[in-house]
Amino acid sequence: MKIAVDVMGGDRAPDEILKGALLASKELESEIVLVGPREIVENAGLSFVETTEVVNMDDPPLEVLRKKDSSMHVGLKLVAEGKVDAFVSAGATGPLFLGATSIVGKIKGVERPALGVAVPSLKGFTVLIDAGANAKVRPEHLLDFSLMGIAYARVLGVESPRVGLLNIGSEENKGHEDLRKAFSLLKEHLGDNFYGNVEGHDINLGTVHVVVTDGFSGNVALKTMEGTAKLITSVMKESIKEGGLFSLIGAFLMKKSFDRMRERLDPRTYGGTFILGIRGIVVKAHGSSDAKAIRHAIRVAERGIRMNLVREIERGIPHVRNSGDGR
């Protein structure tokens, strides 16, 4: 397995990206292929592909197609040509998403690819889709998202994933017209796999395995979770310091438990987001990713390769297309 890494993507590129790639190369079986300027990548001790251009974080999406020798464009092309099995980038979402759909290409039957991420819940994880790619969607897009989310959850070991539609209430008649139409579509096509409407708190409670929503709401939910996780760890640290000697002793005795909790809540450990619905494995890392986050994103990419994520989505989409939904 080969995983290409965009050395120039992200707010902390190239240093943190290189560190993360090196960490991953020591832990994973996959060969890591760095994509970036020769002067930056040639002495890292890993395979590399030289590029001369950069898609900047504030570049408009079309720049990924114009800058054909950028690390992002070249990395996506490596996936499209089968020269690597996956590509990881912390670059800007807009260019990466457009590049993935245009260069790697969409799976037949998928109109709108989406960002899917597994976030921690009380029952293990919840797949959130769309996590930020499509701000406005139609009801049929949410059906596609649910099918891709089911495939992702199966890859993660859930035999019969249950799907919830993110809404402002659990009742069937809640939300605007498009959400009510989406509810009917999911109920018709998913059958027993459709749980119904869920609310924001259900994401981390693990009420369902897959939460489907538009990219605007999904991204707000994801960023809120990230902020809440940071708040919890910060408040705990402050409370321990303010509690005096006995609090410090108690914290020392519970250090392993606290470390496990902090690791589980750390946004860097679930920051690798698949672009689902394309004909290859592309993982979007957070723009502010440090080495730990990049290492995890590469690990996510390897998991997608091992579990044949693309094939699972390809298997899940056609049966709905042929079931008379009229599209």
Swiss-Prot record:
Domain of life: Bacteria
GO molecular function: phosphate:acyl-[acyl carrier protein] acyltransferase activity
Keyword Lipid biosynthesis: yes
Reaction catalysis annotation: a fatty acyl-[ACP] + phosphate = an acyl phosphate + holo-[ACP]
UniProtKB keywords: Cytoplasm, Lipid biosynthesis, Lipid metabolism, Phospholipid biosynthesis, Phospholipid metabolism, Transferase
Transmembrane region(s): none
Entry function: Catalyzes the reversible formation of acyl-phosphate (acyl-PO(4)) from acyl-[acyl-carrier-protein] (acyl-ACP). This enzyme utilizes acyl-ACP as fatty acyl donor, but not acyl-CoA.
Family that this chain belongs to: Belongs to the PlsX family.
Subunit description: Homodimer. Probably interacts with PlsY.
Protein name: Phosphate acyltransferase
Taxonomic lineage: Bacteria, Thermotogati, Thermotogota, Thermotogae, Thermotogales
